[in-house]
Curated annotation (Swiss-Prot):
PANTHER family per UniProt: ALPHA/BETA HYDROLASE DOMAIN-CONTAINING PROTEIN, PHOSPHATIDYLSERINE LIPASE ABHD16A
The keyword Membrane appears for this protein: yes
Protein name, as recorded: Phosphatidylserine lipase ABHD16A
Main localization, broad class: membrane
Activity regulation comment: Specifically inhibited by alpha-alkylidene-beta-lactone KC01 ((Z)-6-(2-Oxo-4-tridecyloxetan-3-ylidene)hexanamide).
Disruption phenotype: Mice were born at a much lower frequency than expected and are smaller than wild-type mice throughout development and life. Despite their smaller size, mice appear normal. Metabolomic characterization of brain tissue show decreased lysophosphatidylserines.
Enzyme Commission designation: 3.1.-.-, 3.1.1.23
Catalytic activity field: 1-heptadecanoyl-2-(5Z,8Z,11Z,14Z-eicosatetraenoyl)-sn-glycero-3-phosphoserine + H2O = 1-heptadecanoyl-sn-glycero-3-phosphoserine + (5Z,8Z,11Z,14Z)-eicosatetraenoate + H(+); 1-hexadecanoyl-2-(9Z-octadecenoyl)-sn-glycero-3-phospho-L-serine + H2O = 1-hexadecanoyl-sn-glycero-3-phospho-L-serine + (9Z)-octadecenoate + H(+); 1-octadecanoyl-2-(9Z,12Z-octadecadienoyl)-sn-glycero-3-phosphoserine + H2O = 1-octadecanoyl-sn-glycero-3-phosphoserine + (9Z,12Z)-octadecadienoate + H(+); 1-heptadecanoyl-2-(5Z,8Z,11Z,14Z-eicosatetraenoyl)-sn-glycero-3-phosphocholine + H2O = 1-heptadecanoyl-sn-glycero-3-phosphocholine + (5Z,8Z,11Z,14Z)-eicosatetraenoate + H(+)
Organism, as annotated: Mus musculus (Mouse)
Record GO terms (molecular function): monoacylglycerol lipase activity; phospholipase activity
Enzyme active site: 355, 430, 507
Record keywords: Hydrolase, Lipid metabolism, Membrane, Transmembrane, Transmembrane helix
Localisation: Membrane
Amino acid sequence: MAKLLSCVLGPRLYKIYRERDTDRAASSVPETPTAVPAASSSSWDTYYQPRALEKHADSILALASVFWSISYYSSPFAFFYLYRKGYLSLSKVVPFSHYAGTLLLLLAGVACLRGIGRWTNPQYRQFITILEATHRNQSAENKRQLANYNFDFRSWPVDFHWEEPSSRKGSRGGPSRRGVALLRPEPLHRGTADTFLNRVKKLPCQITSYLVAHTLGRRMLYPGSVYLLQKALMPVLLQGQARLVEECNGRRAKLLACDGNEIDTMFVDRRGTAEPQGQKLVICCEGNAGFYEVGCVSTPLEAGYSVLGWNHPGFAGSTGVPFPQNEANAMDVVVQFAIHRLGFQPQDIVIYAWSIGGFTATWAAMSYPDISAVILDASFDDLVPLALKVMPDSWRALVTRTVRQHLNLNNSEQLCRFQGPVLLVRRTKDEIITTTVPEDIMSNRGNDLLLKLLQFRYPRVMVEEGLRAVRQWLEASSQLEEASIYSRWEVEEDWCVSVLRSYQAEHGPDFPWSVGEDMSADGRRQLALFLARKHLHNFEATHCTPLPAQHFQMPWHL
């Protein structure tokens, strides 16, 4: 009877993976003797085959889940309509509650029938036995066997806790349960007295901004967190996860962030290969509708690096909602996991981000200054110009206030706090992070990210003549135009390198540098173009085109 109840309440099982190399798939948790017998993958098909009863019950429950999601998103309009029609009176609500209760009882009965179907299936009984044993004792052997199954990630045991590193226990400098530290925007009206009366006056605007951010704004900014989209993408996500596990020996893990969100991760270890780049770990930060199963992790994987992918809060197996604070909390536990559980030194970690993933990448660079490098592909400097682009002009004040208070993705501000090597990849046909049309390459916000970075690091070089030369170079939309502008100013790269190395040897590596202070205008132009070319590479593609492995290069450094 206990096993039947476990089958009724147990998670949905999607797939049984082919047997993998046990040494590479084993967890780093010390092994203890308690374990359950391993499932034989040779006798069962790798795709889980539910019996007819379980299959049909699953279909009914999945359909009910979709209807519930549609009802949830349309509830404000439905309540308004019912109110206008007078259907919210007590005489109408009571019969409706009876219908709803009957429907819930029917769905509970369907769930029980699904449990009976699972109970009669030896594949599911074997799986639930392994899952229960792993929850009781997370030995290396139990976790290895559990990794052979793909199931509802909510039932996966936590592999790493944000407080697990010994350096954080009792530390005042680490994150609290409220979250890690973020850079806060400056007040919109500096110098205004923050009196009680002013607070009352601003209250309606603050309430409106909060409602917009937590309803329409968050879902527009992170469409991958919408349940219906995830439901539609589920077959593709399962296929991508199977590829990472079976072909790349990926290891899935659940991390618990300081805010209580559970973060879904996938690690592919290449340290045992002959390729030297396998010693470096690339942590990938996906876009606003990207998942590690089908996202940018494929680029460093093809290039031979060790890779750690993770899903935003609210995406696929990760819980929570993707607001900036939750995003930073998730990134923090991912980096801690890479250092303290996977065993990578910060100097061997590269942060690679695509599009909106630039926020978490630049936060990690700011918070972990010893990491090796940062690569930002198709990213931007600030969210406000892009948000204003897609909203009506009459909403300008509301949009600006909402972004600054609740969705402040200040990539350039965070990136300027990082002292290490940086590479920006600009898509020359990008249709997402341009503020006008894709053909207008100067409206690409990647340009602003580059200019702000160079102006912070080399303020004496990026004066009027240097800034003008870099802007001309950024207007080039092809390699031929780039080379033409570069040769027009007769940039001597050896001279530029020698100047920078001499300054570094005398004054140290910390930015900002005062190099270029006593330099001629021609010298500043040469140095500005040289630095721009080293920090930004063009890729002739649209926003969503996967970056080929040959374009994945480590950033330049002296």
